[in-house]
């Protein structure tokens, strides 16, 4: 068969299946790393995630996503022996703000392991693999209560933080999603607005949880994914969205998906996909960075199971511009 130039160009322009795109890097990308975030800055990709020991913060860097799989992790900070920041070191996120590097993370105390709050590290070096990481203290919210999973983003010239927190007025110990403008990388401007709480049955399996917000601005909308339910196979993603020109600090600007948008796939042996982040490539394509296990059944507390692994796959969009997460892809090279 003779192929014309037009035919060749059409083939080159045709969408590449998600599984084919994902083959550019291993799946999983990194074993035993939960709550992953990949940040592209300059010519580098940076990866941070929760380590299974919950005792330190690691940073990896590579020229490609695939390179992160074999990049040597550098420990940038270790937990304290006692007091604040001495237990449950979770969900670090790297950000380059106002010409400096910051890590926002969650941590508890050795004597009160569930006294989890938000904390900040800062590094003035232009290279986050160099310089000194300095503790900048607690990033305080409206309440002194269980608080975790901060993510910082900028939109229309304003900086925001979204996070998960327990409202002390609630008796069910649920965690909800909140948002606030930021005065600086270490301080909220206030007030804080509740964007989502566990309303649906799928958000209340094993635990009553909305947590781990992640933000993507795409196609005229601001999307915020979040994770729901317990941390086993029931773990999944929900989705909030607002118009790109809306007031993000007005609850009426936001809509919420009535069902989960990213769930376990027994067919692909992927369970509990969640705590994601979004990575926008230079060409505008979007990747979903998340963790999942390759088995369903867990003995004991899922938080003590080390099987969550970092995974990356392309994110598609429907004809009307909504994210189409698809299923978590089967493991492969």
Please place each PLM-identified region on the residue numbering:
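Carbohydrate-active catalytic/glycan-binding domains of CAZyme proteins
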Residues: 2-3, 9-12, 19-333
